[in-house]
C-alpha cells in the first residue's frame, strides 16, 4: 500500500489501522510509487538474473538443459543435475525433474526455483504445464519483481495470461533475513493480477510485531509501481476542538492524467465531514478542485463548507496563466476544522485569475483578485480591496536610447472595490530616463523620472473631496558606487575580500496627498535593498517625498578557491535634509536630520553553520525598530539545531518572539524533532511541538504532540500518531509535513 505523494493538504496523522479496507497507490503524476529503505535484500533470487536471463515473452517454445536424462517408461523422462527449463521469459531451475511427454507436464519434488517477469518463487513441490505456461507450486516462497515484496504460500497457481492465485499467504516487505518480518499480511486467499497491477486478499489480517491490527474480509493492494484505485491509509488524530479525528480516503485512478480522492472524515465533536479532490494534467495545464462539506456541525448547528480550485497553464511561449480560488462558509472555519498549519495561520483566502507575459524586453500582467478574511482575531476588520481588474506593464530592464542613455517605464491600471466602501479606479505610470556607466571598478546611474497617479472615485463621500484627484511628482536620483577586492591569506588559506562603498541621492518634492484614498499601500519590512528605493511605500496610493542621501558599505570575505561566502556585512544610513510627513495611519513622520540606520551581517562557519543578524536603528529614540538574530546548525538534511529572535515595533501589533527548533537522530533508527515559539511581548507560548520517529527497514512510526495558540485567550492541543508499513502504506505526507515544518522552522516568523 502506498499513500499519496506531494500532497501538502492536511497533517492529520494516521493511526495504526494501516490496512483498514483496501489500499491504493497514488503518487504524483509521473512519479514512482514507493522506495524501501535500503537495509538488506528482499529478493535473494535477484543474483540469479545475470546467470539465467529471460527470453522473449512471446516465444512459446520450451528448451530443456540437464546434466543427465533418462527415459523411465514410454513418454516419461527423468532429468537430473542442474536442470534448466526455459519458456519465453520464464525459467525453471531444479536438481531433478520428471517430464511427461504425453501431457507436456514437468514435475519436481525438491528445490524448485522459478524466475519470471512478474514473480520469482522457490518451492518444494511443483508442476508446470510447459505448453500452456500454467504451474502449481506448493510450500512456496515468492518475491514480487515489479515492487518490493515477498511472502510464503502453501500453494501458488500461475497462468500465462491470467492472475496468479495463492493460498494461506503471508506477505511482507521486510528483508529476507527477518523471517516473517516485523509486519506481515496474512490471508487465506490472494490473487495477483499483474496486468492491472493489483493484488486482492480475502479473509486478511495485518499483523505487526505479532499483534493483529485489523481484520478485513477483502483487501486490495498494489503489486507494481502503477497507480491503482482503492482505499488509502486511514489518518487519525485528536484535538480539543474536534475530538477523535479519523479519515479514510478512497483514491480513484481515473486515467493516467486524471484522478480523484474521496475522504469521509469523522470528528467525534463535530460530525461526519465529506472531502473530495479532483486532479488533472493535460495540454491546457494542470489543476486541482477540492471541496469539504460538514453538514450540521454538532457544535455550531450549521452547515460548513470549503471550496478550492487551482489551475496553472502555459497557453503560449512566454505566457503563463493561473487561477486560484478558495472560499469557506465562515471566518472560523480553519480555526475549528483545519489541521493544516499553513491554513490555520492564514489571514486571508485569495481568489484570483491571472495572466502573465515575460518577454525579453517587456513584462505584462493581468489579474482579477478578491480576498476573504479567515482570521477570527481580526473579526470585523474590512477585507482588502478587490482588484477587478488589474493590468500592469513594465520594461524588463532599462532599454537603450542613445549612447549611455536608457529609459524605463512602469504602468498600472486597476479598479478597486469593496462591499460597503467606496470604489475607484487608479492609473499609475512612471517614466524614467537616465544613464548607466559601469566600468567594473565603479558605477554611476543618474536617473530623472516623472510619476503620475490619477483616480476616478465612484464614491468619494468619505474623503469630502473631488471625484478625480491626482498626483504628479518628479523623481531625481543618483546611484554611485565603487568596487574593491583583494586577495588575503589567513591561517594558510586563501581568501578574497571585497569592499563596496555606495552613495545614493534621492529627491522627490512634497505633494499634498490628503485627497487620495489608500487602497493597497503599506509600509514594507525594511531591509538593505530598501535603502535604495525611490519610494518608502509599497503601492501607488502614496509616493513619499524625499531629500536624502543614503551611504552604505558592503564587505565580504569569500573562499579563494570556491568563492563561497565566509563572512558578509553591510552598513547603511539614510540622512534626511527635509522632513517627511506621515502619509499613512499609524505612521510616524521624520524630521530634518533624522536618520534610518540598517546593519546586516552573516557568517558561514563551515558548511554546516550559519549565523545571521539584522537591525534597523532609530537614532532619535535610541532603540531598535526591527531586529532579527538567528543561528542554524545543519550538518545533514535531517539534522538541525536553530534559534531565532525577532523584534518589530513598526507594526500595528508589535511583536517580539523567540523560536527554538531542532531535529536530530538519537540512533540510526530513532530521531526526535521539536519546536518552541514564544512571545516575549505577551509572555505566552505560541506553539510547542515535540515528535519522535522510529524507522526500521520496512516500517516506521511517528508520534507528535502539539500545543498552540488559536487566539490570545484560546489554546488547542493534540496528539498525533502515524504508522508506515513499507509497501502496504506510506501514510501520506500528513504528519510528515507537520514534522518537516517544525524541523525547517519559519525564518520569517509570523
Question: How would you describe each model-predicted region?
Answer:
Residues 47-59, 64-66, 80-96, 109-120, ...:
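Interaction modules related to DNA damage response and DNA replication/repair
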Residues 98-99, 106:
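A low-complexity, Ser/Thr/Gly/Pro-enriched, surface-exposed linker/loop concept
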Residues 3-16:
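Bacterial N-terminal signal peptides that target proteins for export
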Residues 35-37, 65, 113, 119-138, ...:
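Outer-membrane beta-barrel proteins and related beta-barrel translocases across Gram-negative bacteria
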Residues 14-25:
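Bacterial N-terminal signal peptides
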Residues 27-32, 652:
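Boundary at the C-terminal end of the N-terminal hydrophobic targeting segment
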Residues 30-56:
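Compositionally biased, proline/threonine/alanine/serine-rich low-complexity intrinsically disordered stretches
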Amino acid at each position: 500500500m502506498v499513500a499519496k505523494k506531494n500532497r501538502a493538504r492536511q497533517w492529520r496523522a494516521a493511526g495504526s489501522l494501516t490496512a483498514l479496507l483496501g489500499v491504493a497507490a497514488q503518487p504524483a503524476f509521473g512519479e514512482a510509487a514507493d522506495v524501501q529503505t535500503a537495509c538488506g535484500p528482499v529478493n535473494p533470487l535477484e543474483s540469479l538474473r545475470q546467470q539465467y536471463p529471460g527470453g522473449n515473452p512471446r516465444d512459446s517454445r520450451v528448451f530443456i538443459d540437464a546434466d543427465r536424462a533418462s527415459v523411465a517408461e514410454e513418454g516419461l523422462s527423468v532429468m537430473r543435475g542442474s536442470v534448466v527449463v526455459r519458456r519465453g521469459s520464464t525459467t525453471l531451475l531444479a536438481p531433478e525433474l520428471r517430464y511427461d511427454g504425453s501431457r507436456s507436464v514437468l514435475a519436481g519434488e525438491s528445490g524448485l526455483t522459478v524466475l519470471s517477469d512478474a514473480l520469482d518463487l522457490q518451492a518444494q513441490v511443483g508442476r508446470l504445464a510447459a505448453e500452456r505456461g500454467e504451474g502449481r507450486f506448493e510450500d512456496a516462497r515468492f518475491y514480487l519483481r515489479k515492487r518490493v515484496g515477498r511472502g510464503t504460500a502453501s500453494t501458488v497457481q500461475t497462468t500465462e495470461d491470467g492472475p496468479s492465485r495463492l493460498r494461506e499467504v503471508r506477505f511482507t516487505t521486510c528483508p529476507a533475513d527477518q523471517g516473517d518480518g516485523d509486519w506481515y499480511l496474512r490471508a487465506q486467499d490472494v490473487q495477483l493480477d499483474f496486468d492491472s497491477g493489483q493484488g486482492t486478499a480475502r479473509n486478511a489480517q495485518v499483523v505487526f510485531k505479532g499483534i493483529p491490527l485489523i481484520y478485513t474480509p477483502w483487501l486490495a493492494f498494489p503489486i507494481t509501481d502503477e497507480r491503482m484505485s482503492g482505499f488509502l491509509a486511514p489518518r487519525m488524530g485528536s484535538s480539543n476542538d474536534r475530538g477523535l479525528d479519523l479519515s479514510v480516503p478512497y483514491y480513484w485512478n481515473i486515467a493516467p492524467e486524471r484522478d480523484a480522492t474521496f475522504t469521509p472524515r469523522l470528528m467525534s465533536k463535530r460530525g461526519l465531514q465529506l472531502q473530495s479532490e479532483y486532479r488533472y494534467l493535460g495540454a491546457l495545464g494542470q489543476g486541482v478542485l477540492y471541496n469539504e462539506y460538514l453538514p450540521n456541525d454538532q457544535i455550531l448547528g450549521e452547515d460548513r463548507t470549503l471550496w478550492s480550485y487551482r489551475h496553472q497553464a502555459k497557453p503560449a511561449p512566454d505566457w503563463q496563466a493561473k487561477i486560484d480560488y478558495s472560499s469557506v462558509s465562515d471566518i472560523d472555519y480553519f480555526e475549528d476544522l483545519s489541521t493544516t498549519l499553513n491554513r490555520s495561520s492564514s489571514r486571508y483566502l485569495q481568489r484570483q485569475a491571472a495572466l502573465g507575459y515575460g518577454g525579453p524586453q517587456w513584462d505584462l500582467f493581468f489579474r482579477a483578485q478578491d480576498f476573504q478574511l479567515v482570521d477570527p482575531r481580526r473579526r470585523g476588520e474590512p477585507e482588502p480591496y478587490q482588484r477587478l481588474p488589474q493590468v500592469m506593464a513594465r520594461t524588463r530592464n532599462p532599454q537603450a536610447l542613445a549612447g549611455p542613455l536608457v529609459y524605463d517605464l512602469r504602468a498600472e491600471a486597476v479598479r478597486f472595490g469593496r462591499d460597503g466602501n467606496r470604489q475607484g479606479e487608479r492609473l499609475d505610470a512612471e517614466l524614467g530616463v537616465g544613464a548607466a556607466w559601469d566600468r567594473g571598478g565603479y558605477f554611476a546611474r543618474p536617473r530623472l523620472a516623472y510619476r503620475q497617479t490619477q483616480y476616478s472615485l465612484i464614491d468619494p463621500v468619505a474623503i469630502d473631496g473631488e471625484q478625480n484627484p491626482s498626483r504628479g511628482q518628479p523623481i531625481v536620483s543618483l546611484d554611485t558606487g565603487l568596487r574593491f577586492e583583494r586577495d588575503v591569506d589567513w591561517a594558510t588559506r586563501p581568501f578574497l575580500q571585497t569592499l563596496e562603498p555606495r552613495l545614493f541621492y534621492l529627491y522627490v518634492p512634497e505633494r499634498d496627498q490628503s485627497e487620495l484614498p489608500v487602497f493597497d499601500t503599506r509600509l514594507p519590512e525594511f531591509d538593505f535593498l530598501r535603502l535604495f528605493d525611490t519610494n518608502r511605500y509599497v503601492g501607488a496610493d502614496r509616493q513619499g517625498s524625499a531629500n536624502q542621501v543614503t551611504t552604505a558599505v558592503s564587505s565580504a570575505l569569500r573562499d579563494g578557491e570556491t568563492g563561497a561566502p565566509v563572512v558578509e556585512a553591510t552598513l547603511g544610513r539614510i540622512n534626511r535634509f527635509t522632513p517627511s510627513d506621515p502619509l499613512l495611519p499609524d505612521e510616524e513622520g521624520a524630521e530634518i536630520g533624522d536618520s534610518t540606520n540598517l546593519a546586516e551581517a552573516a557568517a558561514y562557519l563551515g558548511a554546516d553553520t550559519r549565523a545571521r543578524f539584522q537591525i534597523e536603528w532609530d537614532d532619535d529614540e535610541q532603540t531598535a525598530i526591527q531586529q532579527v538574530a538567528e543561528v542554524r546548525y545543519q550538518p545533514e538534511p535531517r539534522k538541525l539545531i536553530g534559534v531565532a529572535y525577532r523584534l518589530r515595533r513598526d507594526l500595528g501589533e508589535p511583536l517580539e518572539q523567540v523560536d527554538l527548533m531542532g531535529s536530530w537522530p538519537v540512533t540510526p533508527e530513532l530521531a526526535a524533532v521539536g519546536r518552541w515559539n514564544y512571545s516575549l511581548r505577551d509572555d505566552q507560548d505560541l506553539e510547542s511541538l515535540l515528535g519522535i520517529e522510529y524507522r526500521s527497514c520496512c516500517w516506521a512510526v511517528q508520534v507528535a504532540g502539539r500545543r498552540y495558540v488559536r487566539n490570545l485567550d484560546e489554546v488547542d492541543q493534540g496528539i498525533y500518531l502515524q504508522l508506515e508499513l513499507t509497501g502496504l502504506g506510506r501514510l501520506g505526507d500528513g504528519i510528515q509535513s507537520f514534522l518537516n515544518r517544525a524541523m525547517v522552522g519559519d525564518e520569517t516568523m509570523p
